[in-house]
Amino acid sequence: MTHTISGQYGRDTIVLETGSWAKQAHGAVVYKSGNLVLLATVCAADEAKEGQDFFPLTCEYTEKLYSVGRFPGGYFKREAKPPEHEILISRIIDRPIRPLFPEGYFCEVQLQVQVLSADGDVSVAGHALNAASAALAVSDIPFNGPIAGARIGRVNGELILNPTTKEILNSDLDLVVAGTKTHIVMIEGEAKELSNEEMIAALRFAQKHIAEFVTLQEEYAKKIGVVKREVKLKVRDEELLSKVKEYAFAKLTTANQTPDKTARNKEISNVNKEVVEFFKDTIEDSDKIKDIKAYLHELEYEIVREQVLTKGTRFDGRKLDEIRSISVEINPLPGPHGSAVFTRGQTQSLGVVTLGTGSDNQRYETLEGQKEKSFMLHYNFPAFSVGEVRRSSGPGRREIGHGNLAERALKLVLPKPDEFPYVIRVVSEILESNGSSSMASVCSGSLALMAAGVPIQGSVSGIAMGLFSDSSGKYAVLSDIAGLEDHFGDMDCKIAGTRKGITAFQMDLKVTGVSFDVLESVFEQAQRGRFHILDIMEKHISKASSTLAGTAPRIIVRNIPKDRIGELIGPGGKNVRGISELTGAELYIEDDGKVTISGSNQESAEKAAKMVDGFFAEVEVGKIYEGKVKRIADFGAFVEILPGKEGLCHISKIDFKRVNSVKDIVKEGDIIRVKVLNVDKTGKIDLSRKDALEEEQV
């Protein structure tokens, strides 16, 4: 039986339909908004796999190019490996949904959202999250939702729910928010240096609309008569837990006072081994031994949180708002165009900048068509950074997500292309990690950009904030969280920005929501921390280097008429190749007539720029030009004075004396100076070497 419901979501009319498509899925919703059609499906295993001790959730967002009537690019003409933007939306779906499944629910769940029909004016991120939540709402899978997603823009100071793609281009805010009826559970986005107050106002605006769509989903589930399946959750053995606590609590408390990550992990591991060995003599059940390991983790959770909430101190002795020690190195690497090392506690990022030309743009395909980006930040998290051994298999979802967040933090302070016409690549190599490596990447990237001579608008710092709370409403906000505090805390909120305001942000929760009072505290405390970090960074470098690295390309930009691009390129690219061969420079010509000229040195670039100018320069009568003899006839020499523009120097005007043969004075390939005597109506150019010599002698 088909069930349909519709409702307003801001300016959009949303239609939800179930029971007609994908009926064997445990939950399936066709989600419509304008011409946008999404299919969201969810399936869950009946039972958890034997020995499963974590929740295996997979969220996949896929864009079908048939949704806009296009073939996929490439040889195979079918969708294959998901591109980065699909991975990022998959993460937006995953992160707010994951903590809302029941504790102890370990059945495998697969959630998929597919774009079947696209609308060029509709941004998909918020809608994809809504479709995913709706599929869970109509399924029998246990889920403490529903939730809703909202993409928020701000144009001319006015907040907009689910802005169009055109509105986003003019927006100083691009925010994706997920929430329940009463609380925010996830935020992510970028801003053009907005204040804390402006950010909170945007979140309040989002929450109001989120509540509307949550209500619509609740009505829909009630209309369908959804009954959730009964599942066996992992039941705690209170007697065994009590025995483990009695034996291990004091030992774990002592081990947790060790500030060094490596030493602490070793001590915790030793305690865990000791406890397991102690109980092995009395417990033969292997599942019970696994339970003991889980209970030890629970005790550690309790110890760390109790210390923060009752004593106001942290495992490493820091105050709640205290930042770890920071050190900075500028240009430690001689070869790259710019580099910096940013170390905060036991987290260390090496930021490296490479400057390139238009041909280095990253090209990618979206539903809107082929796109290019001239700034990219790549984040690498090798196993050695946390002292582990594992196979290297390229960037995963986490690396892509962290890199994107750091990229968004920095891209809004970059100079405009006409001020600094370089393609810029930043790579963050995480050399060691103990929490907040993405924000360390922001700091090292900002420092490296300045070291490379990129005139950014201001230094950017980033900080990760944590939250510990209890059922009574008591909470503590932590600045610059370490890995342990991220693991055992309720929140991981990353905020980056300049002294003027916020440029990027991301918040994930492990609880079912956070109040606006808490959020205001987080943003205010984060600002103090960011400014402290900026103070240290700016002691080392506070403005861009005045010179580029010797190995960086030199770029000159010219703008030519669009209808004359073909003249510059020449038949089969002859003219462009000729310029490159003569100067050693490379030319990158865009459809709008922008010509980027890059040379290995300034002389090479300037020589090529002069030749480009020559193609579009008008011949001036009375001006002396330096030209190349292209061919010789009995009656004179043809001289190229500008690219593609030849004139005739008659034999009578080659020299002061009588000339019997042109070849007696000039030969093909000679560079000579000639004066333009006349340009007739047909464009024929009359040249004189004799007049040029005479004028220069005077």
UniProtKB/Swiss-Prot annotation:
<dbReference type="InterPro" id="IPR020568">
    <property type="entry name" value="Ribosomal_Su5_D2-typ_SF"/>
</dbReference>
<dbReference type="GO" id="GO:0006396">
    <property type="term" value="P:RNA processing"/>
</dbReference>
<feature type="binding site">
    <location>
        <position position="486"/>
    </location>
    <ligand>
        <name>Mg(2+)</name>
    </ligand>
</feature>
<dbReference type="InterPro" id="IPR001247">
    <property type="entry name" value="ExoRNase_PH_dom1"/>
</dbReference>
<keyword id="KW-0479">Metal-binding</keyword>
<dbReference type="InterPro" id="IPR036612">
    <property type="entry name" value="KH_dom_type_1_sf"/>
</dbReference>
<feature type="domain" description="S1 motif">
    <location>
        <begin position="622"/>
        <end position="690"/>
    </location>
</feature>
<dbReference type="InterPro" id="IPR015848">
    <property type="entry name" value="PNPase_PH_RNA-bd_bac/org-type"/>
</dbReference>
<protein>
    <recommendedName>
        <fullName>Polyribonucleotide nucleotidyltransferase</fullName>
        <ecNumber>2.7.7.8</ecNumber>
    </recommendedName>
</protein>
<dbReference type="Pfam" id="PF01138">
    <property type="entry name" value="RNase_PH"/>
</dbReference>
<dbReference type="InterPro" id="IPR036345">
    <property type="entry name" value="ExoRNase_PH_dom2_sf"/>
</dbReference>
<dbReference type="GO" id="GO:0000287">
    <property type="term" value="F:magnesium ion binding"/>
</dbReference>
<comment type="similarity">
    <text>Belongs to the polyribonucleotide nucleotidyltransferase family.</text>
</comment>
<dbReference type="InterPro" id="IPR027408">
    <property type="entry name" value="PNPase/RNase_PH_dom_sf"/>
</dbReference>
<dbReference type="InterPro" id="IPR036456">
    <property type="entry name" value="PNPase_PH_RNA-bd_sf"/>
</dbReference>
<dbReference type="InterPro" id="IPR012162">
    <property type="entry name" value="PNPase"/>
</dbReference>
<dbReference type="InterPro" id="IPR004088">
    <property type="entry name" value="KH_dom_type_1"/>
</dbReference>
<dbReference type="GO" id="GO:0004654">
    <property type="term" value="F:polyribonucleotide nucleotidyltransferase activity"/>
</dbReference>
<dbReference type="InterPro" id="IPR012340">
    <property type="entry name" value="NA-bd_OB-fold"/>
</dbReference>
<feature type="binding site">
    <location>
        <position position="492"/>
    </location>
    <ligand>
        <name>Mg(2+)</name>
    </ligand>
</feature>
<keyword id="KW-0548">Nucleotidyltransferase</keyword>
<keyword id="KW-0694">RNA-binding</keyword>
<dbReference type="Pfam" id="PF00575">
    <property type="entry name" value="S1"/>
</dbReference>
<dbReference type="GO" id="GO:0000175">
    <property type="term" value="F:3'-5'-RNA exonuclease activity"/>
</dbReference>
<dbReference type="InterPro" id="IPR015847">
    <property type="entry name" value="ExoRNase_PH_dom2"/>
</dbReference>
<dbReference type="Pfam" id="PF00013">
    <property type="entry name" value="KH_1"/>
</dbReference>
<dbReference type="GO" id="GO:0005829">
    <property type="term" value="C:cytosol"/>
</dbReference>
<keyword id="KW-0808">Transferase</keyword>
<dbReference type="InterPro" id="IPR003029">
    <property type="entry name" value="S1_domain"/>
</dbReference>
<comment type="function">
    <text>Involved in mRNA degradation. Catalyzes the phosphorolysis of single-stranded polyribonucleotides processively in the 3'- to 5'-direction.</text>
</comment>
<dbReference type="Pfam" id="PF03725">
    <property type="entry name" value="RNase_PH_C"/>
</dbReference>
<keyword id="KW-0963">Cytoplasm</keyword>
<dbReference type="GO" id="GO:0003723">
    <property type="term" value="F:RNA binding"/>
</dbReference>
<dbReference type="GO" id="GO:0006402">
    <property type="term" value="P:mRNA catabolic process"/>
</dbReference>
<dbReference type="InterPro" id="IPR004087">
    <property type="entry name" value="KH_dom"/>
</dbReference>
<keyword id="KW-0460">Magnesium</keyword>
<dbReference type="GO" id="GO:0006401">
    <property type="term" value="P:RNA catabolic process"/>
</dbReference>
<dbReference type="Pfam" id="PF03726">
    <property type="entry name" value="PNPase"/>
</dbReference>
<feature type="domain" description="KH">
    <location>
        <begin position="553"/>
        <end position="612"/>
    </location>
</feature>
